Amino acid sequence: MKPKLNDVAKLAGVSATTVSRVINNHGYLSSQTKEKVFAAMRELHYQPNNMARSLQGKNTRLIGVIFSDISNPFFGELVSRIEKILFAKNYKVILCNSADDPQKERDYLQMLMANQVDGIIAGAHNLGIEEYQQYGLPIISFDRYLSDNIPIVSSDNYQGGWLATQTLHQAGATNVAIFTGKSHAGSPTNGRREGYEAYLTAQQLTPHVHELPFELTPALKMMEIKTIMTQHQYDGIFCSDDLAALLVLNVAQQLSLTVPEQLRVVGYDGTALIRDYHSELTTVEQPLADISTLLVSLLLQRIEDANCTLESKYTLPVKLIKGFTA
């Protein structure tokens, strides 16, 4: 028997009115109340009745966009590009910032379903979000596996890691480290690390991997970087994102290391912010314009025809942006 709103209310221990307010994101409700309602909806596999309007073929022209941290220049620019393309096609965006919190991502996904979005672009990196596999909604993923029937768009992270390391080596570095995020299944930085390690192995050089937790504040991350750079005399450092590379350059200045004579540095992402304000940084550029265009194009194809044939993965090439740090 299909669950009803009253069933959700009973299981969550709240009124039917409260469930309705949570579904429609109306008025103030405590996070504890929202979590009880969303948990009950998940347990019962409850779909709000207003989803029927979408099932009747009436689109809402709303697209959900879920990313992990839009304060990061890379995600900020990507979301901006996605929104601009969708707006030009008469779609509006509901933006969700999951902050690398799996439960927050689940709640946002439930909210998007309740608000009858026509499709979702998912770019957070939490694992085990089974809700993506439970709904028949059009979804396109950026940079991570969600389920067998959800296409993935990404740049060539392995080639990017190889290219960055090759650039450092050809600039004269022989003791090359990588500063990267914590390794976990499905993380895009894994490919960058693998490319780094493969190049050094091919050159019979030793990899030096240092993982910097994503949740560290810039100040704490810089302290960690300074400790590492004080203990090790690296002449080349590859950072799996540009923000970490800027911290490395800051620490190098504190330690009186000249760049690129004593230390060569390569970052990763190559956003407009880096190109405009930190052109000194050599970095691997992800093709944000192409990524955003492809994400939207694939999603709209799936919205227009749920049975259209799409590839399981689309990998776009990266390129080196030459500064003077390597």
From Swiss-Prot:
The keyword Transcription applies. InterPro entries: HTH_LacI (IPR000843), LacI/GalR-like_sensor (IPR046335), Lambda_DNA-bd_dom_sf (IPR010982), Peripla_BP_I (IPR028082). Disulfide bonds: none annotated. Gene3D superfamilies: 3.40.50.2300, lambda repressor-like DNA-binding domains. One of its GO terms (molecular function) is DNA-binding transcription factor activity. Residues 1-57 form the HTH lacI-type domain. Keywords: DNA-binding, Repressor, Transcription, Transcription regulation. The keyword DNA-binding applies. Residues 5-24 bind DNA. Negative regulator of scrB expression. This is Sucrose operon repressor.
